[in-house]
C-alpha cells in the first residue's frame, strides 16, 4: 500500500487551479489518512476557492492519481487557503472579462419547460448547433445541474482543460459546451442544495474562458426552481424559449415557466412544440401521439409566436461522429431546427 509521504508527493505535485502553483509549494496538502486494510486514502486539500468547477476537476484528478497508485477508494475534503497565501501567490491582473461584463455581451437564450420529459435538452442542443451552422459563435451551458445530459447527447467524451485561471469549454459541432456532467465521475448523482447550484452556475459565467460568443444557450432544469430563479436574477436581459409537447397538460404546466419569465421581465421569444406528431415513412400519414394543439394554445396564452413543430423521428447516427441526439442539417428535423434558428437570429438582429 502506498505510504503517506508518497501520497503527499503525488498530490503535492498537482497544480492549484487558481494560483497555478504546486499544491505542495502552497502547503495545501493538509491531512492524509491511510487505511491499508481497506485500501482507502483520505486527503484534505486547501484551494484558493472552493465550491467551484475547478474544485470538481482537481477532485477528479486527485482521485484518478491515487487510484492509479493503488487505492481502491479515495475520500477528499476541501478548505480554503489563508488569504495571505492567496495574496502572496496571485499575480496582479486587470479585471477579468467574463460573460457578464464583456464589451459586446452575447444574447442569452434560456430554454425552459414546465415539466421534464418534453425533450427540452434535445431542443437546446440542436438549437445551439443550428445557430452555429448559421455562422454564429455559440456557447451552450447545461444548467440542469441535477439532470445533466448535454455531453452524452452530443457524444462528448473529453473534459474541459484549464488555462491560467480559467476553464476552457469543450467544443463540438462548432459549439462551446460546459456542463456539470464534466465534473462528476461517470453517471454519479449530484446531491446538492439550492445555494450550491447557484454557485456552480455562477462559475460557468465567471470562471470559464468563453472567448467571443454571439449566443449562449442555457438548458434550464424543468420547472421554476432554484436554478431558474438564479438565472432570472443573474441575467436580467435573458431571453426565453418555452418547450412543450402538444399534450394539453404539458402545455398547461409549461405556461408556468412562461409566466415566471414574464413576471421577471424576461422576454419570451416563442414556443417550440416538440414531439408534435409521428409521420409514417411508408405512407406519410401523421399520427398525433400526444394530442394536438398544445403548442398553439400555449403560444396564444403567452402572446408569442409558435417557432416550430418538431416531429418524433430519430437522428441518422454516424458511427464515426456518434452523437445520439444531434440531427444532421440535411435531416428533415435538422431542417426544422435550422428554420427555427433563422427565426430567432432574425428577431435578435432586429432588436440589436
Curated annotation (Swiss-Prot):
InterPro entries: Mrp-like_CS, Mrp/NBP35_ATP-bd, NUBPL-like, P-loop_NTPase, YlxH/NBP35. Induction: Autoregulated. The lineage of its organism: Bacteria, Bacillati, Bacillota, Bacilli, Bacillales. This is Iron-sulfur cluster carrier protein. Belongs to the Mrp/NBP35 ATP-binding proteins family. PROSITE patterns: MRP. It comes from Bacillus subtilis (strain 168). The keyword Cytoplasm does not apply. ATP binds at residues 114-121. GO terms for molecular function: 4 iron, 4 sulfur cluster binding; ATP binding; ATP hydrolysis activity; ATP-dependent FeS chaperone activity; metal ion binding. Pfam families: ParA (PF10609). It comes from the Bacteria. One of its GO terms (biological process) is iron-sulfur cluster assembly. Keywords: ATP-binding, Hydrolase, Iron, Iron-sulfur, Metal-binding, Nucleotide-binding. Signal peptide: none annotated. Homodimer. Interacts with BrxC. Binds and transfers iron-sulfur (Fe-S) clusters to target apoproteins. Can hydrolyze ATP.
